[in-house]
Regions:
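Extended acidic/charged loop-beta regions that coordinate divalent cations
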Residues: 1-37
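General small-molecule cofactor/ligand-binding pocket signal
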Residues: 4-9, 86, 93, 176-178
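Short, acidic/turn-prone active-site loops that include or flank metal/cofactor-
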Residues: 11-14, 124, 151-155
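Nucleotide phosphate-binding/pyrophosphate-handling subdomain across enzymes
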Residues: 30-146
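C-terminal helical cap/extension that packs against the catalytic core
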Residues: 92-93, 135-191
Length: 191
């Protein structure tokens, strides 16, 4: 409509060569980046395309490359986004998925690691979200060995007991109900 140029990033432009518990290394092949080695500092596969999109956006914003390609790639590697598929301790990943797409991406990420790791889910939700649908999606597409439900602070909480009841409808995994979020985290780490 406005005549703005579009710059697509396709998954085929990204060749993943190494995955770890903290990052995904890939080669980017588009624009100024021909076989450029990039590290997306996240466990989630969708962050490869997001990182590539950020680099391509920099090409559009800074076509003279006043910010060097090396600096751009280093900035991607050093990116921190708290609570978004963030590895906070070895084997402990925090994700604040808050909508249907976020849950879908969370599920894909869990599916990519559940063959290698025992999955213990620490879960809470806010009252205005469709948490039953979220729980159903998670339980129908992943295999957690245990679920710890807790409550966030504030007036938007869903009681932990209510969340436990919903989980019990969709999974046979062990369910632990702990309203105190700190105790819930500690409990999840011991399961």
């Amino acid at each position: 409509e406005l005549g703005s140029p579009a710059y697509p990033v396709y998954p085929s432009m990204c060749e993943v060569f190494l995955k770890s518990d903290k990052s995904i290394d890939f080669y980017l092949n588009c624009g100024y980046y021909e076989h450029a080695k990039v590290t997306a500092p996240y466990l989630a596969p969708y962050q490869v395309v997001n990182s590539s999109l950020a680099l391509l956006a920099m090409d559009v914003i800074d076509p003279k490359q006043e910010i060097s390609q090396d600096l751009r790639i280093r900035a991607i590697k050093e990116t921190k986004w708290q609570g978004r598929m963030e590895t906070v301790l070895p084997g402990v990943i925090v994700d604040g998925a808050h909508n249907a797409d976020g849950i879908a991406q969370f599920v894909k990420t869990v599916q990519s690691v559940q063959e290698r790791y025992r999955i213990v889910l620490l879960f809470s939700a806010v009252v205005e979200k469709n948490y039953e649908e979220m729980i159903h999606t998670i339980c129908s597409q992943t295999t957690p060995s245990a679920v710890v439900v807790t409550e966030i602070k504030g007036d938007r909480i869903v009681p932990a007991g209510e969340l436990s009841e919903v989980f019990a409808k969709y999974t046979d995994a062990q369910i632990v109900t702990e309203p105190d979020i700190e105790k819930a985290f500690e409990r999840a780490c011991t399961l």
